Amino acid sequence: MILFSVSPVSIWVFVIYAVTIIIAIYRLFFHPYAKYPGPFLAKLTSWYSIYHTYYGDLHIDIWECHNKYELGNYVRYGPNRILVNTSEGLNAIYSQGKNTQKAKAYRKVSLVPGVHPTFSMIDNQGHAKLRRLVGQGLSNAHIRMYDQELRQSALLFASRLGEEIDRFEPNQPHGNHDGWTSPKNVASWSNYFTFDVMSHLVYGTSYDLLTDSENHWVIEGVLGQMRRISFLTMLPELEDMRFDRILFPDARRKAYRFSAKSREILEARKSKSEEMRHQDAKVDVFLRLLSAKDPETGESLSDKQLWAESNLLIIAGSDTSSTGLAASFFYLSRNPSAYDRVKQEVRSALTTSEDISQGPKLLSCTYLRACVLESLRLSPPLGGAMWRQTMPGGLFIAGSDHDFHIPGGCEVGTGVYAIHHNEEYYPEPFRFRPERWLPQEVGDEAVAKAQSAFQAFSLGPRSCPGKNLAMLEIPFALAAVMMDYDFRKVDSPLGGVGEGKGKFVGQYQTFWAFTSIKDGPYIQFKRREP
């Protein structure tokens, strides 16, 4: 008799190989999502989405998948994930009272160790409790109190763009000696503006990014935090396997540096809280959060929750708004008819800087608002999918010919960039066409259809708490610029920075990092002729 000797290593290799084959067969043929088309590798492993996260084109790949596969509105984008590209799916997944909760991956997403802010809290009841508290600091009534601060920041933003030479990039080519400034990277200046606004609103103090470069590193800190989150929402096990140190070591370091700085500011701000309570001082968001009590339980936020929520508010409120603002400059500088129309509207409605307010004059600038909405549609700040897990019983999504049932325990989402470029809701989806948001020009039905698929700030109870502020910041800044300056795209290679290539020419293309990392457009400014 011949005896074969098999080493323990060989046995383990065989077991791992066999288990891998079994898992692959299950995912390809027996998984509840097996019937849905999608990239072959995505059906087998989440490393497919990690690849597109690493290269920052995940939002584009999602759009391409919807256009490539036969069941175009339903695409499998992970072993346990499906994308839905319809307004019915969008509302079924994200609206109030639906049978979904945040995906399990968000358990790894924490801006402060051991604490989950509203953004990453999975439990719906816990989220509702936190949202009630945070909402007290970002109510419309509170935002109205900051009208003057918003206006002053917008006017400072405009004056910085109007300077002949960029104070933070003095080596840029000078203007053409005909009144035009040197090229300005509007992405950078938009970051400075929105971050100053949010830090002032939240902490009652500003990082002064519009006037001093000392704290410009905080922008990189925010982007580092977002880059880290983008990987963890795709594959949360990365941190357990220590792959975060390989895939995004610099992002991780920047994220922690920003968190430490925000804690320092929080402690300094907290020490002044008692003093401010007894003064006739304007109440910032932090003081409101500090004083907020849940109307049902009477509970208030812990110190760590205060840190996490204030961190989140600054990041969410600044990063999303800055993308919308930079995108607005991009599209207006490339669409002369829209630029001329909105410029005329603003200059006719607003006669002094005091008119830049939450009053009837700025509100009457409906085409300005339409330009902002169209820019957010074409280049959404959060272009990927916000994943949700279906609860027991699953989720039913209405379809044109039959309903779709998503089983419980599976993950589902809608790619924001993809649905924003779905011609079912947006005819000529790659064309900058602000008129699509004006009922008097396209009709109520067309506007309602466009609104049904618009998700720049998400929907329902998990929507961005700062969306109302964002829709003020951007028009304030654009109005402040257009009241005093003309602007144009730079006529040099710098003018192409931020623009897509090939079929995406004319599009403001961002790097997907959960939110958006952006560069450009480079714009020149010239003081308005009297």
Curated annotation (Swiss-Prot):
Keywords: Glycoprotein, Heme, Iron, Membrane, Metal-binding, Monooxygenase, Oxidoreductase, Transmembrane, Transmembrane helix. The keyword Membrane applies. The chain crosses the membrane at residues 6-26. Its EC number is 1.-.-.-. Glycans are attached at N85. GO terms for cellular component: membrane. It is a single-pass membrane protein. Its cofactor is heme. Pfam families: p450. It is found in: Membrane. This is Cytochrome P450 monooxygenase apf7. It comes from Gibberella fujikuroi (strain CBS 195.34 / IMI 58289 / NRRL A-6831) (Bakanae and foot rot disease fungus). The lineage of its organism: Eukaryota, Fungi, Dikarya, Ascomycota, Pezizomycotina. The gene is apf7.
